[in-house]
Amino acid sequence: MWMYLPLEYQVTYAPHARGGIVIDASETGLLIYSTEDIPIGTKLKVAVLFPIGYKLTNFEVFAEIIWKEFKMEQGEKGYQYGLKFIQILEEDYWKLKQLLSG
């Protein structure tokens, strides 16, 4: 399911959160875009923002980068990452399923 949703992620050993974009999602992982160069195998805490009706909500997951690809678009360099979920709470999983069902 193609989507363009804002996300915030934090590398488990880093003090500051960074931003990115969710491009695609499934029940087992995410395809994201970020300008940061992060090594494969890095574990992230990810929060994805999305609308339900007239309000914004989010879900949070812990995920691992399982692949990455360099991208150059509109003169800006960045990376696409394939993330595999490591941990997701039941409530967040329900929100993810709502998002995926449209």
Residue ranges and their predicted role:
Residues 2-6, 38-50:
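Short coil-to-beta transition motif at edge beta-strands of beta-rich domains
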Residues 28-33:
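Short alpha-helix capping/helix-loop boundary micro-motifs
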Residues 27, 68-74:
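Short, conserved beta-turn/loop elements at beta-strand boundaries and strand-helix junctions
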Residues 72-102:
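C-terminal output/interaction extensions
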Residues 22, 63-65:
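Conserved hydrophobic positions within beta-strands
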Residues 50-52, 67-69, 87:
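Beta-strand elements of well-folded, non-transmembrane domains
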